[in-house]
From Swiss-Prot:
It is a single-pass type I membrane protein. It comes from Mokola virus. The chain crosses the membrane at residues 456-476. Gene3D superfamilies: 2.30.29.130. This is Glycoprotein.
C-alpha cells in the first residue's frame, strides 16, 4: 500500500493537537518567484530537520516507553482485614451448655499484614490456623468468652497506577485515590476502617518498569538539539515539546504525545495537565516502519520524476507535485509561469482540514487571502479546473482517507484517572478500635456466677420485693383477725343476766371427804 507520509509525521508541526495528523502542507506565504532551470529542481529530504542549520547528526541513547506498557500499570496487591473470632459459652444449673459464635473486626497494622501475607504465599500453616474459630471452653454457672484475633488476606487485589503522579486508583479507596503510598507509607486506607490495601512488592520497584533504552541520532545546530531520529528512523522535532515526569523519571512530551527522556533536552516549559502522552505499542512501531519506508519510497519517486524531467527536458504541472515538502518546515515551491519554471523559498505549514485552504469554490487560501491563478496554474501541481474548482493532486487519492483513518485509530492518549468518582463506595459502619496488634494466643475470660437469667440480680431484687410484700400482707391479715376477736369478746361481757320465775334447786356442796362420810346413808 502506498502510504502518504505527509499525513503521518507529527513531530514537525508546531501545534499541540493530540493524536491529529497533518492532512496536507501548504506555504504560509508566497513571495517573489525566481526563474530556474530544470537542473535546479531538487527533491526534499523529509527525514531531516526542517530547521535551517540543523544538519549535523550524532548518535545518542534515549529512553522511551516500552511497547505495550499499559499492562504494567496494573499494580498487584492484597487486602488485609482484621477479624476477631469469638466463642461464648454458658453452662446452666443442670449442666446444659449454650454456645454462641460471634465475629468482630479490628484495625490491623502494616507489619502484621505483611507477615500474614508472607505466611499465606509461603504455605505456612500458621496462617490457616489463625483463621480457625477458637475452641470454646465452659464452666458451671458461668459465661466463658474465648476470643482469637486473625488477619484475613485476600489476593490478588489489582489497582491502577497513574504514571503521571504515581498515584493509585481504585473504587475501594475512600476518595478513589491513594496518593501517599510513596515512599514512606506502604499501605492505603480503604472504605472499611478495619481493612488495608498493600502492594505485593513492598519496595514497589517493579511498578514503574515501563521504560526501555533505545539508540537514535540527534540533529544538532551547534550545541542546540533541533530533533532526533528514533530507533526506527522516524524524525521527531523538539518544537512544541514540554517537560513531563513519568514515574519519577524526568523527560519531555513531544507535541504528538510521544514521551522520551535524554540528557539536556533544552526544553524548559512544563506540560499542562491536559497534555497527555500516547500509548506505545507494536502497531505504532510497525506504522513508523511503514512511514520511514514510504518516505524513502516517496523520495525515490521524486528522484525518478526528476530523472524523467531531465531526460525528456519537459516538465508538467502534475510532476511538480512530487517536489512539495511533505512535512511542515522549510522547503521550496515550484510553478510554471508563461512557459518558465519558477521556484521560491517557503515555510510549509500543516493543514488539518481541506476547508482551511479551500474556504469556497475556486479559492485556494495562502496566507490570509485567496491566491489568484495564472492561466489556471497555481503551484506544486495545483491547478484551477475548467469548472472553477481547485484541483489538488493529493485530494484525488482515495488511499489518503483510508490511511488517515488507520493512523488516527492507532493513537490513544493515556487518560488517568480511569476511576469514576461516582463509583467510589461509601463507608458502612464504624470499626472497633484496637491497638498494639499482633498475632496473640487464644484469650479466655470467665464470668462470675450466673444463674442463667439475664440481669439476674435485678430479677432477684424483684422477687425479694414480691416475697416481702406477701409476708406483709399476711401479717396485716393476722393482725386484723386478732383485733376482730378482741372486739367480739368485749361485746359478749356487756350483755345483762335474766332470772327465771320458778326456783331452781341448788346443788349440795360437799367440802371434803369427812363431810361426805357424815352424810345420811353413808
Amino acid at each position: 500500500m502506498n502510504i502518504p507520509c505527509f499525513v503521518v509525521i507529527l513531530s514537525l508541526a508546531t501545534t499541540h493537537s493530540l493524536g491529529e495528523f497533518p492532512l496536507y502542507t501548504i506555504p504560509e506565504k508566497i513571495e517573489k518567484w525566481t526563474p530556474i532551470d530544470m537542473i535546479h529542481l531538487s527533491c526534499p529530504n523529509n527525514l531531516l530537520s526542517e530547521e535551517e542549520g540543523c544538519n549535523a547528526e550524532s548518535s545518542f541513547t534515549y529512553f522511551e516507553l516500552k511497547s505495550g506498557y499499559l499492562a504494567h500499570q496494573k499494580v498487584p496487591g492484597f487486602t488485609c482485614t482484621g477479624v476477631v473470632n469469638e466463642a461464648e459459652t454458658y453452662t446452666n444449673f443442670v449442666g446444659y451448655v449454650t454456645t454462641t459464635f460471634k465475629r468482630k473486626h479490628f484495625r490491623p497494622t502494616v507489619a502484621a499484614c505483611r507477615d500474614a501475607y508472607n505466611w499465606k504465599v509461603s504455605g505456612d500453616p500458621r496462617y490457616e490456623e489463625s483463621l480457625h474459630t477458637p475452641y470454646p471452653d465452659s464452666s458451671w454457672l458461668r459465661t466463658v468468652t474465648t476470643t482469637k484475633e486473625s488477619l484475613l488476606i485476600i489476593s490478588p487485589s489489582i489497582v491502577e497506577m497513574d504514571i503521571y503522579g504515581r498515584t493509585l486508583h481504585s473504587p475501594m479507596f475512600p476518595s478513589g485515590v491513594c496518593s501517599n503510598v510513596y515512599p514512606s507509607v506502604p499501605s492505603c486506607e480503604t472504605n472499611h476502617d478495619y481493612t488495608l490495601w498493600l502492594p505485593e512488592d513492598p519496595s514497589l520497584s517493579l511498578v514503574c518498569d515501563i521504560f526501555t533504552s533505545s539508540n537514535g541520532k540527534k540533529a544538532m545546530n551547534g550545541s542546540r538539539i533541533c530533533g532526533f531520529k528514533d530507533e526506527r528512523g522516524f524524525y521527531r522535532s523538539l518544537k512544541g515539546a514540554c517537560k513531563l515526569t513519568l514515574c519519577g523519571r524526568p523527560g519531555i512530551r513531544l507535541f504528538d504525545g510521544t514521551w522520551v527522556s535524554f540528557t539536556k533536552p533544552d526544553v524548559h516549559v512544563w506540560c499542562t495537565p491536559n497534555q497527555l502522552i500516547n500509548i506505545h505499542n507494536d502497531r505504532l512501531d510497525e506504522i513508523e516502519h511503514l512511514i520511514v519506508e514510504d518516505i524513502i519510497k516517496k523520495r525515490e519517486e521524486c528522484l525518478d520524476t526528476l530523472e524523467t524531467i531531465l531526460m525528456s527536458q519537459s516538465v508538467s504541472f502534475r510532476r511538480l507535485s512530487h517536489f512539495r515538502k511533505l512535512v511542515p518546515g522549510y522547503g521550496k515551491a515550484y510553478t510554471i509561469l508563461n512557459g518558465s519554471l519558477m521556484e521560491t523559498n517557503v515555510y510549509y505549514k500543516r493543514v488539518d482540514k481541506w476547508a482551511d485552504i479551500l474556504p469556497s469554490k475556486g479559492c485556494l487560501k495562502v496566507g490570509q487571502q485567496c491566491m489568484e491563478p495564472v492561466k489556471g496554474v497555481l503551484f506544486n501541481g495545483i491547478i484551477k479546473g475548467p469548472d472553477g474548482q481547485i484541483l489538488i493532486p493529493e485530494m484525488q487519492s482515495e488511499q489518503l482517507k483510508q490511511h488517515m483513518d488507520l493512523l488516527k485509530a492507532a493513537v490513544f492518549p493515556l487518560r488517568h484517572p480511569l476511576i469514576s468518582r461516582e463509583a467510589v463506595f461509601k463507608k458502612d459502619g464504624d470499626a472497633d478500635d484496637f491497638v498494639d496488634l499482633h498475632m496473640p494466643d487464644v484469650h479466655k475470660s470467665v464470668s462470675d456466677v450466673d444463674l442463667g437469667l439475664p440481669h439476674w440480680g435485678f430479677w432477684m431484687l424483684i422477687g425479694a420485693t414480691i416475697v416481702a410484700f406477701v409476708v406483709l400482707v399476711c401479717l396485716l391479715r393476722v393482725c386484723c383477725k386478732r383485733v376482730r376477736r378482741r372486739r367480739s369478746g368485749r361485746a359478749t361481757q356487756e350483755i345483762p343476766l335474766s332470772f327465771p320465775s320458778a326456783p331452781v334447786p341448788r346443788a349440795k356442796v360437799v367440802s371434803s371427804w369427812e363431810s361426805y362420810k357424815g352424810l345420811p346413808g353413808t
